[in-house]
A protein has these predicted regions:
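Extended, low-complexity intrinsically disordered regions enriched in serine/proline/glycine/threonine
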Residues: 1-5, 13, 28, 32
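Short hinge/gating elements
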Residues: 9-16, 136-141
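Short, solvent-exposed secondary-structure capping/transition elements
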Residues: 16-21, 42-43, 79-80
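Conserved glycine-bearing catalytic or ligand-binding loops at nucleotide- and phosphate-handling centers
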Residues: 17-26, 30-33, 37
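Intrinsically disordered, low-complexity linker/loop segments enriched in Gly/Pro
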Residues: 39-47
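A short mid-domain helix/strand-loop element embedded in enzyme catalytic domains
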Residues: 46-64
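Membrane-proximal, solvent-exposed terminal domains/tails of membrane-associated proteins
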Residues: 60-68, 72-77, 81-210
Length: 210
């Protein structure tokens, strides 16, 4: 049997910070449950909680960034070539997205269609594409330059193998300085996460940024 337990409400996610009304409703439900069980209950103070939660939510908004590098053909590239190049680097197609996983099977990086429509396995062999995008969700990968350098190594290999240009969201060709700035930006945002004991790529980060 149990002498007691804790009931919790996730108040911070990619949907934003829970409203005070949600906290009030949750507290009332907990009290009703405790009453039915003939148990005592201690509910956290909503004002004190919000004083902590609001700056935490602001930090999460600030660090919740996905870096996109687009690999674009000046004409077109066949789906067969894209698939072969990605699979040669251990990417696997799953639900319309090519995923790159670590040795434990955890998703690290992904490649998506340039127009955001899913890659369809049956159509890849016969379809031509303008290109694809490589995505780096800095909240979901281990912290540090090493992981970003691994990502960029894959990007450069794919670009070289397929003869594709590397461009940003405005289709401007990437410069060496841009890449240095992005690397620094990633490290700074991940350091912010670590400063509040949220390890990028951890179970807590997965839950917060869901």
């Amino acid at each position: 049997y149990y002498q007691g337990f804790v009931m919790g409400l996730q108040c911070i996610s990619r949907k934003g910070l829970a409203a005070r009304e949600d906290l009030t409703q949750f507290a009332e439900q907990v009290r009703q449950f405790a009453s039915q069980m003939g148990a005592g209950v201690a509910v956290a103070n909503a004002d004190a909680f919000m004083q902590v939660a609001e700056p935490m939510d602001e930090l999460c908004v600030r660090v919740d960034q996905t870096i996109a590098i687009h690999l674009v053909s000046r004409e077109s590239v066949s789906g067969r070539e894209i698939k072969a190049a990605l699979e040669s680097l251990k990417f696997e197609l799953d639900a319309g997205i090519f995923w790159y996983r670590d040795v434990h099977g955890k998703n690290l990086f992904n490649a998506v269609n340039l127009d955001s429509t899913p890659f369809i396995a049956a159509a890849l062999d016969d379809q031509a594409y303008r290109g694809f995008s490589m995505l780096y969700d800095l909240t979901k990968v281990p912290a540090g330059e090493k992981t970003f350098n691994q990502f960029m190594d894959l990007v450069v290999k794919l670009s070289s193998h397929l003869g594709l240009d590397l461009v940003d969201d405005q289709l401007n060709e990437l410069s060496t300085q841009w890449l240095k700035d992005i690397r620094s930006y990633v490290v700074e945002r991940q350091d912010e996460m670590l400063s509040v004991d949220i390890e990028p790529g951890s179970e807590l980060a997965e839950r917060l940024f869901s």
